[in-house]
Amino acid sequence: MDVIPAIDLLEGRCVRLYQGDYDRSQVFSENPVDVAKQWVDEGATRLHIVDLDGAKAGKVVNLGAIEAIAQAISIPIEIGGGLRDRSSVEQVFNLGVQWAILGTVAVEQPQLVQELCQQYPGQIIIGIDARNGLVATRGWLETSEVLATQLAVQMQEMGAAAIIYTDIHRDGTLAGPNLDALRELAAAISIPVIASGGVSSVTDLLSLLALEPQGVTGVIVGRALYTGDINLKEALQAIGPGRIQDIPPNLDFSSFA
């Protein structure tokens, strides 16, 4: 399972929000590039970046920071926040980003999503941010009447590469992932589901690993990495591609003699 560190950008700095509340942000670093390099050094194979200013403004705002990160590291990057038109998506791909995460437009302009999926096959991910099972939009400032599972099925039909599912009530809280919601979503679609929100411990990661056979292929970890509740190297050893339980046991009992 992929363990994907998150970098949330607000005014060019690396921050974490509590339940998506912009008034409850905590700055973890003034230099997002250094943070990105740290996660790469600790074994990350993919990076999740959110332009929080962009999510609010409806257009990409932290272009400079995103470009600097993309140039500084060699692992693939996915980016979301403010990607609500074709030019914004083209803009981030031109910076060297591998995946664009679309959220609000999935609800408001599904036809555009379909066109982008055709233009960039395998590179469009849908971010479904849910509050009590309903999809939130516009930087989580609005809640729609659309069910998360309903949108996931529609986006799969449009050609989306994967779904990132965030439970807003748990995001930034270290309260643990919403396993029931993830199970329900993964059962409804056949494309990969990436979990996000609430992960606080290796125990949480192992509980998500149990959902891997059902289609939950990755987990985005944010606050817990920054507070030290989760060590990235240990997380990768626990559930990553080369995890300890995937290594065949040494059955040479002579070593115990």
Swiss-Prot record:
Pathway the protein acts in: Amino-acid biosynthesis; L-histidine biosynthesis; L-histidine from 5-phospho-alpha-D-ribose 1-diphosphate: step 4/9
MF (Gene Ontology): 1-(5-phosphoribosyl)-5-[(5-phosphoribosylamino)methylideneamino]imidazole-4-carboxamide isomerase activity
Main localization (coarse): cytoplasm
Residue ranges that the Swiss-Prot or TrEMBL entry lists as coiled coil: none
GO biological process: L-histidine biosynthetic process; L-tryptophan biosynthetic process
Enzyme Commission (EC) number: 5.3.1.16
Gene3D superfamilies: Aldolase class I
Catalyzed chemical reaction(s): 1-(5-phospho-beta-D-ribosyl)-5-[(5-phospho-beta-D-ribosylamino)methylideneamino]imidazole-4-carboxamide = 5-[(5-phospho-1-deoxy-D-ribulos-1-ylimino)methylamino]-1-(5-phospho-beta-D-ribosyl)imidazole-4-carboxamide
Pfam families cross-referenced by the UniProt entry: His_biosynth
UniProt GO cellular component terms: cytoplasm
Compartments where located: Cytoplasm
InterPro entries cross-referenced by the UniProt entry: Aldolase_TIM, His_biosynth, HisA_bact_arch, Isoase_HisA-like, Isoase_HisA-like_bact, RibuloseP-bd_barrel
Record flagged with keyword DNA damage: no
Keywords: Amino-acid biosynthesis, Cytoplasm, Histidine biosynthesis, Isomerase
Active-site residues from the entry: 8 (proton acceptor), 129 (proton donor)
UniProt xrefs under PANTHER family: 1-(5-PHOSPHORIBOSYL)-5-[(5-PHOSPHORIBOSYLAMINO)METHYLIDENEAMINO] IMIDAZOLE-4-CARBOXAMIDE ISOMERASE (PTHR43090:SF2)
Protein family membership: Belongs to the HisA/HisF family.
Name of the molecule in the record: 1-(5-phosphoribosyl)-5-[(5-phosphoribosylamino)methylideneamino] imidazole-4-carboxamide isomerase
Species name: Trichormus variabilis (strain ATCC 29413 / PCC 7937) (Anabaena variabilis)
